[in-house]
Regions:
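SAM-dependent methyltransferase
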Residues: 138-213
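Class I SAM-dependent methyltransferase SAM/SAH-binding core
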Residues: 49-94
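Conserved class I S-adenosyl-L-methionine
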Residues: 1-38
Length: 258
């Protein structure tokens, strides 16, 4: 997953712009809520846009992703920008860190790739273990409503340029509660020909209530849920059906058994 698609993903201006905005507002958010952080882990970092943006703002960054091709691009970009960011291949369910970070980030609905409760809980436990006591995690999540809605037999074009064409086809399996995204792309090569890329991705939606129970069991406390990406309105203040939600939680002194 994200292997043949990595180059297409890296070319998307939407992903890059979103992460630039995140890098802009996160330091302000941390200041507003009184969170002090130096060592930051970006889980499911992709091609490293957010990690590099935060590194430019003075944080010490480590980025991990399951896809080696994504990490290869992230390393190349960091080297070209002369940024000291440590990019490593790692599975979020088995992060190779213990009490190493003050802040852990996981965006891009990456936790929705955990298709079972067991895998989701493993990821939360690994995240808690990677944090120092008193450290914080911030992640986003597509709700069950969002996945059922977004994946309801939709098709659209995400990129259409001379260099890259990218189309998405969505499908939702109600029996399994899993959304399937099929990506078809054509990438222009130096000789003028186009390479066809095709990947399939699966995501599952979860309710904040369910995830909160798992996070508390993993060793997180002081959970707060928000309904917009600038983290300005809490979940209980929003009367609409939530789609993408955000969570901040603090690492307690307790870590669940792996």
């Amino acid at each position: 997953m994200y292997e043949s698609y990595a180059e297409v993903f890296a070319a998307s201006p939407g992903h890059r712009e979103y992460n630039e905005r995140l890098a802009d507002f996160l330091p302000d958010l941390l200041g507003r809520v009184g969170v002090s952080a130096r060592d930051v882990l970006d889980v499911a970092c992709g091609v490293g846009d957010l990690a590099m943006g935060l590194a430019r703002r003075g944080y010490t960054l480590t980025g991990v992703d399951l896809a080696p091709a994504m990490i290869d691009i992230a390393r190349q970009r960091a080297a070209a920008a002369d940024l000291a960011v440590d990019f490593e291949v790692a599975d979020m369910r088995r992060l190779p860190y213990t009490a190493a970070f003050d802040l852990l980030l996981c965006f891009g609905d990456s936790l929705n790739y955990m298709l079972t409760a067991a895998d989701f809980r493993k990821a939360l436990t690994a995240m808690r273990r990677a944090l120092r006591p008193g450290g914080w995690v911030i992640f986003d999540l597509l709700t069950d409503y969002a996945v059922a809605t977004y994946y309801a037999d939709q098709a659209y074009i995400l990129q259409n340029s001379d260099e890259v064409f990218e189309a998405h086809e969505n499908d939702y399996n109600r029996a399994r509660e899993v959304g399937t995204l099929t990506v078809t792309a054509f990438v222009r090569r130096p000789d003028g020909t186009y390479q066809r890329v095709r990947e399939t991705h699966h995501q599952r939606g979860y309710t904040p209530e369910r995830v909160q129970r798992w996070a508390e069991a993993a060793g997180f406390t002081d959970l707060t849920w928000f309904t917009d990406w600038e983290i300005a309105e809490t979940l209980d203040e929003d009367d609409s059906e939530p789609t993408r939600v955000f969570c901040m939680a603090r690492a307690s002194g307790r870590i669940a058994a792996p």
